[in-house]
């Protein structure tokens, strides 16, 4: 494939995302979809923009806790590779690991996929798009936290009614991860992370997991409150509240969210 001709991993990743984005936009054109409507490219309340950036940090303790749990069962396949890429070229890594994934992955999963699977039931749509988002990361360790992030981004796009919100949160989350990796790689703290990544789980790691529970819970509560605030600022809170009323859910159409051919294509 392309990797046979392109040996630089960052260049390959960047080109891959550009091709993927082009293919996605061509798909929407072939289907006759209005790109702006399908992808929900709408302006967001300026105040909520800062809350979205804050959300990208409050979900980090939760994602970190999920990663620690996943490391007990699955080998971390990305930490070492990411560190090497960051140390070689931080700015290029931010482009190919933060900006492009935030742009392209959100276009696909919170844009195309979610627009198809939310038709009958937005809650199921969020879970399904998050499931596909997790699977797309191609390993069990990343699937665990990616599934969680997919749920957060799904609620976020509904709270703001704009894909720009999930793109922003995705980019900030990935970008801050790269910066954190860069800083940790210059300290002894990274050695502990490397041992965990290689599968050397000890009682100390279990203690770390237990100790991280309070921060994860605080991060989860703050994240929920931020999504509520974002929904309020964008005039979406009343609509989202109806999701949790049984009588309203009973009125949702009993139809398939998407056809078999769509799921097969995904």
Where are these regions (language model features)?
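Hydrophobic alpha-helical transmembrane segments
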Residues: 14, 49-54, 91, 95, ...
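Alpha-helical transmembrane segments of multi-pass integral membrane proteins
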Residues: 211-227, 262-266
